[in-house]
């Protein structure tokens, strides 16, 4: 009686291990295919899975100064904040979309933002 019970226990263990391997392989593919999609969309950066920051920095920006730089880049200077360097990637009728690279200790962080009037909506952050 004990032998058959241990047989079913080992069978159950291998079944759980098999499903775990399948689920982790799908997660692996999902993450790296998502990175490839973002790289096609924004070819200059490598994005991790998207984090939403739609209200981040909303109250800290009163009137940003957008200054044109070389090669289509623009610098956005915030009062009392760090400088952002951004590249415009899309132009819509009501808003512009920018990619921001922050000049702080978090070197390499990229902010993808929407610019609407004087308000920047941060859509995602990439590393």
UniProtKB/Swiss-Prot annotation:
Keyword Membrane listed: yes
Keyword annotations: Membrane, Transmembrane, Transmembrane helix
Transmembrane segments: 12-32
Subcellular location: Membrane
Keyword set includes Transmembrane: yes
Gene Ontology cellular component terms for the protein in this record: membrane
UniProt topology in membrane: Single-pass membrane protein
Additional information: Almost completely overlaps RNP1.
Protein name: Putative uncharacterized protein YLL047W
Species whose genome carries this gene: Saccharomyces cerevisiae (strain ATCC 204508 / S288c)
Organism lineage string: Eukaryota, Fungi, Dikarya, Ascomycota, Saccharomycotina
